């Protein structure tokens, strides 16, 4: 069994034969229900891009857990320089295997910086763990090539999609992404953290209709696959 827990904003904890964090923005996250020290035994940390609300506490958690950080090559180097001794795996789109976990880094339409300097490119991740396939879109707008993700690596058991608009897809665009991705289940994320990304997940659910099962998770709640 694989469990996918929503930690608020775009942060998720995936637990199966390996324990994986994605975009662990906990400190300073008004939605957060966990702290960095709660993840002392995590195996991998995936970072979609360098913005502070996604890179978050990745370095700190890697320090206390010994987890490997998987990120765009430039971002991996940035983290390794900032947090000496942390092990990173730098990618630049494409598939790889890290400690028995199949990971595909896929494009995302978004910027990536530390607030001052551009660092690498934004991405999403497809993770295959214990027979289940999880897609975390990162921050992105909808794009036609999303249909390749399910064609190449599907079926996708759960897609974690931003719906807040302003910086990413809104509910209408995210519903279109569901058509392209054809996931069995979709979990909305990256909304209602701050006023600029206010969105109604129930509106998203209506737009998706019967194309996929929409599960709206509150921070701290989890989905079993």
UniProtKB/Swiss-Prot annotation:
The keyword Hydrolase belongs to this UniProt entry's keyword annotation: yes
InterPro entries from the UniProt entry: Metallo-B-lactamas, RibonucZ/Hydroxyglut_hydro, UPF0173, UPF0173_UPF0282_UlaG_hydrolase
Alphabetically ordered keywords of this record: Hydrolase
One annotated GO molecular function: hydrolase activity
SMART domains (alphabetical): Lactamase_B
Pfam families in the record: Lactamase_B_3
Family: Belongs to the UPF0173 family.
Annotated protein name in UniProt: UPF0173 metal-dependent hydrolase PYRAB05000
Lineage: Archaea, Methanobacteriati, Methanobacteriota, Thermococci, Thermococcales
